[in-house]
C-alpha cells in the first residue's frame, strides 16, 4: 500500500522562551550559560512561604504575539497548576494556563516549497499561553547519578499551539520557520535553538483520507528544523508500517534520536486530566485592559506579511523574492536601508536588482565568511551605490562583482559613492560607445574565422564564443548587450 493511501495529520506545540531579563514569577536572571543553580531564587526552588509575582514584561510579549497573529487577547485569563513529578520540577507542579489562556485563536500564513511548485497555506492556531519552564537534568558528568540545574526553572515561556492543519513534514517545517521568524521579528524571543529558546513538539498521526483522526504520538523537544523534518518523516513511516502490519498505535510521548534518525518511546502520553489542573491560589486572574492591548498594537512594527505585500505592489518584486527578503527582520531592514539611499521611482530597476544582490552575492559572501547581515562589511548605502551603477549602465554585472569584492575588502570609503570611487580608480566604467567597440569586434571577427563560419552554419554556441572574445579584448568593460547587438548585425550582413 502506498503513502498516498494515507493522510498525515500534524499539529505543533512550540515553546518560545520570552526574552525578559528576569523570570516569569521571580526576579532571578534568565541569562544563559551561568554556573548551575546560581540563578535560582527562593521562588524557583519552591522554598516554603514565598509567593510568585507575575512579570509584566512576559505579559506584554504575549499580547504582542496575539496582536501579530490576529488572535483574541483575553481580557481575563487564569494561571493554573499542572501537577506532575519530575526531579527538575521542585514545586511538584508547573505554573501554566489551561482553561483560560491569554491568547486565543489566530493564524499564520506559510509558504511551502520553492519555484513553480510553491504554495501558500494558512495554519490556524488554537491558543498561546504563558507558563514557566522547568529545570534541567544533567547526566553526562555524573556516575550512577543525575545532577539538577534549576537556573532554567521559572524562565518565561509562551507555548504556542497550532490546530492539526499540517499534512506533511514540509508544511510543519515551513510553519515552524515562519513562527520562528515572527517571534524574532516582533522581538519577544531570540529564537536561539541551540540554547533551547525555541523548541518544537510535534503531534503526529495518520489516517485514511477523509477518515477519523488517528491516534497521535508526540515527538518532544526538537531543537532544529532538520531534526523536525527527519523526526516527522520517520514517525509517519513507522505509524503506517505498524498499522499495515496489523498493529495499533498507542498514544505516547517519544524522543527523536539524531544519531539513528529514529523515534523511541519515552512514556505513555498523558491526557489533561492526568495533570489535575486547578487555578493557582497564589496568583490572581490576569486582567488585561483594552488600553494595554491598544498601546501594544500602536507600537507594533510592520509585520512580514504586510511588508511582503508592499514589496510586491510598490517594487514589482515576485512573491518568491518578497518572501525571501521578509524571512528575517535583519534582511528586510538591510534591504529597506539600501532602498532608502537609491532611486526607487516607478520603473526603476534598482528594487529588483537590489533584491537579487541582497539574496545572491551578498548572502553568498556572508555565508562564506560566517557573518550575519547586520555585520556585513558592505553597508546598505554602499550596495545601493553599486546597484545604481548597474541600473544606469555604468558597469556590467561582471564588473559589479569586482566592485563588490573591493567594497567587501574595505576599499572606496564609506557612503553611497564608494562604488563610484572604485570604478574610477580602477578604470572599470563600461564601454557603451559603439565607435570604441567596433574596432574590437572587427579584430575578433578577423581572428576567429572558424567561429564565424560555424555560426553562419547554424551553430549558436559559436556566437557565444565570439561574444566572450570581445569581452576578453575589452577586459570585461564592453556593454554585453551592445556587443550582442553589434555582433549580430555584422554577422548577418
Swiss-Prot record:
Catalytic activity: L-glutamyl-tRNA(Gln) + L-glutamine + ATP + H2O = L-glutaminyl-tRNA(Gln) + L-glutamate + ADP + phosphate + H(+); L-aspartyl-tRNA(Asn) + L-glutamine + ATP + H2O = L-asparaginyl-tRNA(Asn) + L-glutamate + ADP + phosphate + 2 H(+)
Gene3D superfamilies: 1.10.10.410
Family annotation (Pfam families): GatB_N (PF02934), GatB_Yqey (PF02637)
Record-annotated membrane-spanning stretches: none
Biological processes, Gene Ontology terms: glutaminyl-tRNAGln biosynthesis via transamidation; translation
InterPro entries assigned: Asn/Gln-tRNA_amidoTrfase_suB/E (IPR017959), Asn/Gln-tRNA_Trfase_suB/E_cat (IPR006075), Asn/Gln_amidotransferase (IPR018027), Asn/Gln_tRNA_amidoTrase-B-like (IPR003789), GatB (IPR004413), GatB_Yqey_C_2 (IPR023168), Gln-tRNA_amidoTrfase_suB_CS (IPR017958), Gln_synth/guanido_kin_cat_dom (IPR014746)
EC number(s) on file: 6.3.5.-
Single Gene Ontology MF annotation: glutaminyl-tRNA synthase (glutamine-hydrolyzing) activity
Keywords, in A-Z order: ATP-binding, Ligase, Nucleotide-binding, Protein biosynthesis
Quaternary structure and interacting proteins, as annotated: Heterotrimer of A, B and C subunits.
Entry function: Allows the formation of correctly charged Asn-tRNA(Asn) or Gln-tRNA(Gln) through the transamidation of misacylated Asp-tRNA(Asn) or Glu-tRNA(Gln) in organisms which lack either or both of asparaginyl-tRNA or glutaminyl-tRNA synthetases. The reaction takes place in the presence of glutamine and ATP through an activated phospho-Asp-tRNA(Asn) or phospho-Glu-tRNA(Gln).
HAMAP family: GatB (MF_00121)
Family classification: Belongs to the GatB/GatE family. GatB subfamily.
Protein name as catalogued: Aspartyl/glutamyl-tRNA(Asn/Gln) amidotransferase subunit B
Annotated source species: Aromatoleum aromaticum (strain DSM 19018 / LMG 30748 / EbN1) (Azoarcus sp. (strain EbN1))
UniProt lineage: Bacteria, Pseudomonadati, Pseudomonadota, Betaproteobacteria, Rhodocyclales
